[in-house]
């Protein structure tokens, strides 16, 4: 067998394994229900089928080909609403055997064209399952402190469900049955408008007015008793659930901002810590760089030590004068002949300062002391000599 034929064998299986959207519908015994189904864009056969428990196949209940199953003749109608993209199937005079699994679909093949799964549950009006169900209690660890608790909501016991049977719909005044122990009161059916204003005193209308109102209600097609009953129960459960979820939601509304605030504080602390560490690292690098620059400058200086200078010598800071000038001054003196007498001893002047002399100012002015030779110091009378003792 060719391999390309194998996917054809899995087509029915894939259609059976497709997950369909499921809708649950509940109805009262003897009442009616309306099932909403999606309407395809193409003009094809649409139907409502019921799944058989034994074989698993889906048998057609009603379709657009004017087919109605024998069990539902006179009790089921199918209407199309193209503008809303849906079609409605209304089933009246419900019985307990009508409970089961239904499916909406489109196409000629009933088993493969399913678009929606519908579960119908038919029950009596006084079934115990319709009593108020207690809400599950929240765990003790989830209870909020006293400061964060919300005020208690109204108790759900204030809502009283009134159920009537089809046999009691024609009776207007209430009938009281007395007994030695208990008292049971059967109340007539109350419409939605009268249930809202239930605290007001009741007024009974004349028979002519009642007949006119009944005729008007017949023209306007009032809602079925099952629908009204479902509406009241659904509203009651929604209020109970809303009060419970409101208390739980209040705790989450307080807990979430607290966690976010702590998370933001932790992030801010990390950012500040990183900034401080970076600043410290930059300061350490700057210090190390300064130390390296100082060491580099000291290593580049010449290592030859300067000539030590005496602190007491005032001329140590002045540069030395070249000796060429002194040589030039001494070279002008005439040299005495061999027969000439020796010149007298030159005048010796002590260069040491006097004791009473004030301290000399340090300056770079040069003081030149020239010793004039004896030949230059002679007068016209060469025989006169002046001897200065040393």
UniProtKB/Swiss-Prot annotation:
Stretches the record annotates as CDR2: 59-70
Protein's organism: Homo sapiens (Human)
Cellular localization per UniProt: Cell membrane; Early endosome membrane; Golgi apparatus, trans-Golgi network membrane; Lysosome membrane
Composition bias, Low complexity: 293-311, 325-334
Outcome of swapping residue 45 to A: Completely abolishes interaction with IgM resulting in impaired IgM internalization
An annotated GO cellular component: plasma membrane
Region (CDR3): 106-115
Side of membrane Extracellular, spans: 17-251
Site features described as Receptor capping, chain residue numbers: 253
Topology feature Cytoplasmic, residues: 273-390
Ranges that cross the membrane: 252-272
Outcome, altering residue 69 to A: Completely abolishes interaction with IgM
The protein, known as: Immunoglobulin mu Fc receptor
Pfam families, alphabetized: V-set (PF07686)
Region (CDR1): 40-45
Region of interest: CDR4: 33-115
UniProt feature, compositional bias: Pro residues: 335-346
GO terms (BP aspect): cellular defense response; Fc receptor-mediated immune complex endocytosis; humoral immune response mediated by circulating immunoglobulin; immunoglobulin transcytosis in epithelial cells; negative regulation of apoptotic process; regulation of B cell receptor signaling pathway; signal transduction
Keywords from the named record: Cell membrane, Disulfide bond, Endosome, Golgi apparatus, Immunity, Immunoglobulin domain, Lysosome, Membrane, Phosphoprotein, Receptor, Secreted, Signal, Transmembrane, Transmembrane helix
Description of post-translational modifications: Phosphorylated on both Tyr and Ser residues.
Misc. remarks from the entry: Expressed in lymphoid cell lines such as Jurkat, CEM-T4, MOLT-4, HB11;19 and Reh. No expression detected in nonhematopoietic cell lines including Hep-G2, HEK293 and HeLa. Detected at high levels in chronic lymphocytic leukemia cells.
